[in-house]
From Swiss-Prot:
Name used for this protein in its record: Phosphoribosylformylglycinamidine synthase
Family: In the N-terminal section; belongs to the FGAMS family.
Pathway: Purine metabolism; IMP biosynthesis via de novo pathway; 5-amino-1-(5-phospho-D-ribosyl)imidazole from N(2)-formyl-N(1)-(5-phospho-D-ribosyl)glycinamide: step 1/2
Region (Disordered): 305-327
InterPro entries: Class_I_gatase-like, FGAR-AT_N, FGAR-AT_PurM_N-like, PurL_large, PurL_linker, PurM-like_C_dom, PurM-like_C_sf, PurM-like_N_sf
Chain residues that bind Mg(2+): D679, E718, N722, D884
GO cellular component, as recorded: cytoplasm
Amino acid sequence: MMEILRGSPALSAFRINKLLARFQAANLQVHNIYAEYVHFADLNAPLNDSEQAQLTRLLQYGPALNSHTPAGKLLLVTPRPGTISPWSSKATDIAHNCGLQQVDRLERGVAYYIEASTLTAEQWRQVAAELHDRMMETVFSSLTDAEKLFIHHQPAPVSSVDLLGEGRQALIDANLRLGLALAEDEIDYLQEAFTKLGRNPNDIELYMFAQANSEHCRHKIFNADWIIDGKPQPKSLFKMIKNTFETTPDYVLSAYKDNAAVMEGSAVGRYFADHNTGRYDFHQEPAHILMKVETHNHPTAISPWPGAATGSGGEIRDEGATGRGAKPKAGLVGFSVSNLRIPGFEQPWEEDFGKPERIVTALDIMTEGPLGGAAFNNEFGRPALTGYFRTYEDKVNSHNGEELRGYHKPIMLAGGIGNIRADHVQKGEIVVGAKLIVLGGPAMNIGLGGGAASSMASGQSDVDLDFASVQRDNPEMERRCQEVIDRCWQLGDANPILFIHDVGAGGLSNAMPELVSDGGRGGKFELRDILSDEPGMSPLEIWCNESQERYVLAVAADQLPLFDELCKRERAPYAVIGDATEEQHLSLHDNHFDNQPIDLPLDVLLGKTPKMTRDVQTLKAKGDALNRADITIADAVNRVLHLPTVAEKTFLVTIGDRTVTGMVARDQMVGPWQVPVADCAVTTASLDSYYGEAMSIGERAPVALLDFAASARLAVGEALTNIAATQIGDIKRIKLSANWMAAAGHPGEDAGLYDAVKAVGEELCPQLGLTIPVGKDSMSMKTRWQEGNEQREMTSPLSLVISAFARVEDVRHTLTPQLSTEDNALLLIDLGKGHNALGATALAQVYRQLGDKPADVRDVAQLKGFYDAMQALVAARKLLAWHDRSDGGLLVTLAEMAFAGHCGVQVDIAALGDDHLAALFNEELGGVIQVRAEDREAVEALLAQYGLADCVHYLGQALAGDRFVITANDQTVFSESRTTLRVWWAETTWQMQRLRDNPQCADQEHEAKANDADPGLNVKLSFDINEDIAAPYIATGARPKVAVLREQGVNSHVEMAAAFHRAGFDAIDVHMSDLLGGRIGLGNFHALVACGGFSYGDVLGAGEGWAKSILFNPRVRDEFETFFHRPQTLALGVCNGCQMMSNLRELIPGSELWPRFVRNHSDRFEARFSLVEVTQSPSLLLQGMVGSQMPIAVSHGEGRVEVRDDAHLAALESKGLVALRYVDNFGKVTETYPANPNGSPNGITAVTTENGRVTIMMPHPERVFRTVANSWHPENWGEDSPWMRIFRNARKQLG
């Protein structure tokens, strides 16, 4: 039976206004829209009055419901029938944890009530199309239609393909019907194999074969034999990549054989809780570094949010499934798309060439895709710290003559680093009889055929198959699985995981054969043991679907009880679905039908399928010399600063958490003005050291339109000039991931790909001492469509994205582009040696040209000398600032440095030649260093020692003020206000934020950037930062116990434990399942801290589901109430813990006036480094800090204080319960965005109880308790930041 319960309003006023404007623009006469959430409960038994009241209260969250009866025509948007939304999975979990077992499933829709003039049926279809994502949702016309969401079908049987009867044609038909993308020789192979076996293949077997042998999974092109211009080539592409490892194996621990590559890290204190006692402590051991970079291009073109989200999620799983289990740590992300054409902000180089109907626009991708990628990382708890963004789309004269080149099929890049124990780097042995396990969520009828679909050019597959290959994301589930993996690797030698892989393309049909095959075993499986939410799925759908957040593992039978205990504690679902066998055979039994859908020798599935041969021709681009007739430097500056590749990327940065883990030493945002210009990302290796890891990206795809090999060399060079900003030492410490995107089969591209791979694999990387131990290829970068009577194609440039990873010697020595105005000198290191080529530059692009001669690596020895010289200068602390030269050239390098320093620049470029346009806009490798004036000679001498004398040019200096002046022999070449340039540079991000977020907030942020008087972040302290007030109490040897409380989805508990640990506490890991299960009580604890993250993925209101699981469980409710009433206890709630505790007001004495925390005013997750002031309040944790102003990490989507009315706010203020407020850089309490990131009244962001024993706050002091973890800080701070005082206050209070 289904019950319907109304929910809160679903759209803010500005979202409704945006919808109305879209309808008006489409000439649809819609006058008014009201939207509210509607909940549908699928019940297995009726609820009594008390249970009904409980369910009703559970579903009350968000803004108060409007009591009126809505007017207008109803359009109900729900998830597509046959799918289960991530919201449903999490909300149903909460209901069950609150004791509502009669609820089989909760689902949510949005009821739109549309008041409109008379519209035709077609116009109503247009209205409906604007309201839903056709890939994920459907539209009903009545609330009761939602019953279709809960219809259960009978299991479907396996179906066979009559190969023996119909011959080869049966396989050809199945290939088309199932979207298998099989090649002719693979069809021959299958015909032969099954004829030999003497039986017909089942659909599930063909599907499994297609996924396992797709280009996506098998990398056929990279393993192919090559004939170029009639000459056989000696090596495959993959062999040339492997050559880098053969030449430079140094520091590599694992390459080419696992889900990620591993290199040597540093010996540090890894901080985690003991399995038996729950007590956190440091464990001194090597923390080796793993690295992986994936792409998720096809799904992102079809449905950008889930496409990018599952792209990030899949890469995170790759890291966790490395060796015998590892820990993902920090991420990177990248996008290449066609022109944005922002409505009302179209740029002169943007022409509309059309697109296929089934893929979305570049603007849609960049509106939704980055949000999906960020949301997954945020909810999982991994900071995303670097990335790139390129737009390109034009008709150009390239290798194949004049044709359309661009990214209608986008690149969505997801990568990152993690850590792994030394004894877990290599996978273990799968013993015969080992239990084969699926860890993670249930099978769902989604994401079918992703591997094969992504191997086709967009436009080749059937529209319904595109629908089928879209996936859905549930990062909170992946977090639970990762917590299990963490518990396993933390056991060291007792780790129950023998072997682990992630489930990705092809689902279990790819993952399970890979697991047993890699372990030298076979497998015997039972289909119906696989967890499934949809009983009507066929065997093919159960075995081959790509439901995310799953891992496959082998665990020895005697270790199963331990594994079961770990999973139950973390509430991570798992199923034992088979046993490892001696014989390398794969069998899948179906209990329901008592048959065998799969019964195959593994070598048929994974054996030597026909090897591909590529017989290709070389084509050379002629290009056209740059026509400079109408180009002035002033106009060029304006245009280039508006090119999205160059322009400010704040809209891509502040949506992503950049502080979780407490180990982020360098994020994108630089300096007191938080300008997104960092060259690389840096993390600390642990919470007790200054060793670390660095990541950077290099990418110069447009250059491939003129010279394939140069483009590849420049990508490596740029990654190197970016990562050189931190202290690494030996260049051999740097390891690269190479992600290759190409339109295989397009004239000239295959030979060009071979050239590019050879240039880096056989030549450049070996010469530099660089290794490429990991990478990926995507070989179908083309879209085809019909535009009127014309057949069109959009082909991407050959695109190599290089990600560089390295161990860092001392994270404190990382340079940024932030200029200093002390007596200084700016020096250009020009690795282009005066070539100043303008082909395929940003300048050429904004004038709709390609040019003829591009930049290149001009001298490999000098590139190596540059890196070594930079390392010597960084270690000697001789540099004040560094920024590489890249898209936009020297002009952009200097401008971004001035933006970061909020200062002026006076430079002279006479030494760079007479061609000022080329000097300013060429994109040759190199960059600008800033040195103290007195160090200039010594620095120049050192650069000369490394062979760079002819590359170094004195430019001028940074000055206080607002002028950006470039001269040549004292004649003005360009002069402008730095603030004006800053505003131009910011306009793209402003327009994107206006479209995507609350336009009022976007306008306020843009206005703030135009304020030259802004002093930037600053610090005023009312206490001595160097005084450790906890020291006398620590000296007694007593360590009070603090319960570090977490719920499923919480992700900030480790750094919280470390902060309390440093202040003299014993931090104990306490999961809500421990309390609910009665394994632990709160009676033994002196302090309680509820940590940040996304409990239950923030469904049913941020923190509200967590709170209700306490309030609706009588025993646990008593436990909390008793703790809060006990004298001599302390409690802290941060972020999600703050939201949760604000919903426990009925249990906490003196908290009656506390507010609720609701959706940010911007309607967006906000990750900021915000300035706050400590106000006078009873809070015991903030004693002695009153009046201090200092920046703090902020990361939340629902942090806006909501009070009942003005009287409530006045009472909260008059009682003095406000503990922290947001202030602007002038020190004034503010409600203006982004200084106040959520719009809270009176800047309120922390409150306390009347006795001061319980304090709750939205910002994260635990993430910045170490100075090194602050995005910016005064130079004179030591190891501890001022926020350490909170934790020391706690220790002092407990005596």
